[in-house]
Design a protein with these regions (language model features):
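OB/S1-fold single-stranded nucleic-acid-binding modules
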Residues: 3-4, 8-62
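Short Fe-S-cluster ligation motifs
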Residues: 6, 53-74, 313-329
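Local cysteine-cluster metal-coordination motifs and their immediate loop/turn environment
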Residues: 17-41, 286-319
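Short acidic, glycine/serine/threonine-rich loops at helix termini
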Residues: 216, 295-296, 324
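FNR/FR-type flavoprotein reductase catalytic core
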Residues: 137-291
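Ferredoxin-reductase
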Residues: 55-152
Length: 329
């Protein structure tokens, strides 16, 4: 069992206190959980209880919806769609950080909102790039979008990546980024952040199940060379990936970002445990289902030992902790 500080991605931001605080379900504030004493789980420099009181004991206004002009649409065999659209400057600034995502819809019907990670947010041009894998009824409607039309988005949201604290702590070190499939999209802001903090970044990409390399253009922009290799083989870590990780550790890498499905993250953690390298810091994609993004609907919740319910659209976590003690009934 590892010691973990509970953290809320929205604590101390313009969207705090939220509806959870208003209803006594705040992730951080003990008094807004029903206790009669002050014992914040992870203080962010702002008293959430005081903020709620100053706001008339009501939650602050939530995220807004925006109608944005589409600048470019690239369709990759009706499997993946890359969309570039122009957003308000404030929104572009808010979506630069790792883990940023938005809810996208072709129209104003909220039933068709789909959470999509930000691939790039250019604060010079206010152009935001997203990559959408076409899977079901929500994403199929996105195939109809064309340049010079409008797209409805809601945001900003920031909990698309677990282990943000570990990303921010990397300065002047060596990092390894492992990405598979659609995970190349949320990988890009992480790489941008690591490079801005003078890190030496090695990137390995597994295109499976696609044939196109969607990140090639942006990696060239950041002057990063990526090598391609098979990272997963029939649900387990491939021999190639094990060699890549072992060699990276010998070279002094002390941080790994895993951009892919939960099974990929789990396998990397298991392999590091076998190597007795629990000292390696990690970050990974947040693959929990998202619906409202505010911790209200319960789509993102998971149950853990000790009758704990965690809302992962808001709660930041260390990648190792999202599998430890998790219950499936």
């Amino acid at each position: 069992m590892i010691k973990e500080l509970r953290d809320c991605i929205d604590a101390g931001t313009e969207y705090c206190p939220c509806k959870l605080a208003e209803t006594g379900e705040c992730l951080i504030c003990s008094q807004l959980q029903g206790a009669c004493f002050c014992d914040c789980l992870n203080w962010k420099g702002v008293c959430i209880y005081q903020e709620l009181f100053n706001n008339g004991n009501k939650a602050k206004e939530g995220r807004k919806s925006y109608s944005c002009l589409i600048k470019d649409v690239t369709n990759f065999n009706d499997e993946v769609v890359m969309i570039k659209f122009e957003a308000p400057h404030k929104l572009a600034l808010d979506l630069v950080k790792p883990g940023s995502y938005i809810f996208v819809s072709q129209n104003e019907n909220k039933y068709f909102d789909v959470p999509i990670s930000i691939m790039e947010s250019d604060i010079e041009t206010n152009i935001i790039t997203i990559l959408v894998e076409v899977r079901g009824i929500k994403t199929k409607s996105i195939l109809n979008l064309k340049a010079e039309e409008n797209i409805i988005i809601r945001g900003p949201y920031w909990n698309g990546v677990f282990g943000i604290k570990n990303i921010n702590s990397q300065k002047g070190g060596k990092s390894l980024v492992l990405a598979r499939g659609i995970g190349v999209a949320p990988m890009m802001p992480v790489i941008r952040k690591l490079l801005s903090q003078d890190n030496d970044v090695k990137v390995v990409i597994d295109k499976t199940p696609f044939t196109d390399d969607f990140s090639k253009e942006l990696l060239l922009k950041y002057s990063v060379e990526a090598c391609e290799n098979e990272l997963l083989d029939k649900g387990t870590l491939s021999d190639h990936c094990k060699v890549i990780i072992k060699e990276a550790l010998k070279e002094g890498v002390n941080y790994i970002h895993i951009a892919g499905a939960d099974i990929f993250t789990y396998e990397v953690i298991e392999y590091l445990d076998k190597l007795d390298r629990n000292d390696i810091l990690l970050s990974c994609c947040n693959n929990f289902k998202m619906c409202c993004g505010e911790g209200i609907c319960g789509a993102c919740t998971a149950r853990f030992s000790g009758h704990r319910v965690r809302r992962f659209c808001k709660e930041q976590a260390d990648p190792r902790s999202i599998f430890e003690g998790r219950r499936f009934i």
